[in-house]
Amino acid sequence: MAASVLNTVLRRLPMLSLFRGSHRVQVPLQTLCTKAPSEEDSLSSVPISPYKDEPWKYLESEEYQERYGSRPVWADYRRNHKGGVPPQRTRKTCIRRNKVVGNPCPICRDHKLHVDFRNVKLLEQFVCAHTGIIFHAPYTGVCVKQHKRLTQAIQKARDHGLLIYHIPQVEPRDLDFSTSHGAVSATPPAPTLVSGDPWYPWYNWKQPPERELSRLRRLYQGHLREESGPPPESMPKMPPRTPAEASSTGQTGPQSAL
């Protein structure tokens, strides 16, 4: 009897050890209470820039020279997009709710760069030196919001005279194209101008047929007053007026009006 009881106890010992091992597992409370990090928490916030009031001093500092050198701020920027063809429009903005998105544009990625109409050296990097045209946003990679600020700042800088731009003056060439090439010559006048005839044939007087005239006379017999012939070749010229006659008419004019 005692042996059978001992055997049953020994058989149940491994099952008890398994239950004990399962109860001894300790789960930390931190893993059960914490939430997964959201996308907004993973984004970095915008730090405060020391050059906010005077942004042009940053472009003269050694930090700027070490980071960019003599190249524009957008020279080494590459857009992150799907496929081999980039979209024709950049993102609307790189900073949402004071959080910077991934791969921000050349201006939003450096918190020490500020778009201001007094920051002339920064504005000159986004204007073509030959034509004076502002570079498009897909060319420089800046977001739509920063591109709008750049356009307004460049226009304001031009109005204040801080950003110099010129319109090239092209001098006309003093060449006579009629003699510059053998195949080019003076255009001959029209044949109608040489003969003295009008340019259009319907402007010339044509005598209507006599049969048509007789028919019209019978039709409008009671309404015709006089018959008009062909128009005169030239209008009659009025004799020139002497200065004395012109002055006398000018003096009598106001009196007759009264």
Swiss-Prot record:
Domain of life, source organism: Eukaryota
One GO cellular component term: nucleoplasm
Region feature Disordered, mapped onto this chain: 216-258
Any GO MF annotation of the entry: structural constituent of ribosome
Keyword Ribonucleoprotein (UniProt): yes
Keywords: Mitochondrion, Phosphoprotein, Ribonucleoprotein, Ribosomal protein, Transit peptide
Protein name: Small ribosomal subunit protein mS40
Gene that produces this protein: MRPS18B
